[in-house]
Regions:
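A polyanion-binding, active-site-adjacent surface
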Residues: 3-124
């Protein structure tokens, strides 16, 4: 059985965001910083974003951010989402049962303050 139109759209989107960027910019879905990232970090971030999009396939609205947060999307690949919200005790409900991974080399998961605020407001 072939992929759904949604799956094909997600695949296209992930290919687009992983394209080359100017050397002065860091693209979380393509680049690795050996000081902070696992070698497979871009693949992990794309996989995390794929899982997020599949979990919200029927969403009525989306949030769009202007730039990836330095301690959130930068490591998870998911806008407004820190590593603490996809793994461990603070894992968000939609992330449970999904193969979410951290991409940072840090001992503890990165926390993005704005991510905690955004998801707190969404949860009500």
């Amino acid at each position: 059985m072939g992929k759904s139109e949604f799956e094909l759209s997600v695949d296209r989107f992930l290919r687009l965001i992983a394209k080359d960027s100017p050397k002065t910019l860091f693209n979380p879905w393509k680049d690795v910083n050996a000081q902070f990232d696992m070698k497979s970090a871009p693949s992990i971030r794309k996989s995390n974003l794929r899982q997020y999009l599949f979990a919200h396939e029927n969403a009525r609205a989306i949030l769009v951010g202007e730039a990836a947060g330095w301690a959130g999307c930068r490591f998870t690949g998911i806008p407004f989402t820190g590593e603490n919200l996809i793994t461990g005790d603070e894992k968000l409900e939609w992330a449970s049962g999904r193969p979410m991974k951290r991409s940072s080399l840090a001992e503890k998961p990165y926390k993005e303050r704005s991510a905690t605020i955004v998801w707190g407001e969404i949860a009500g």
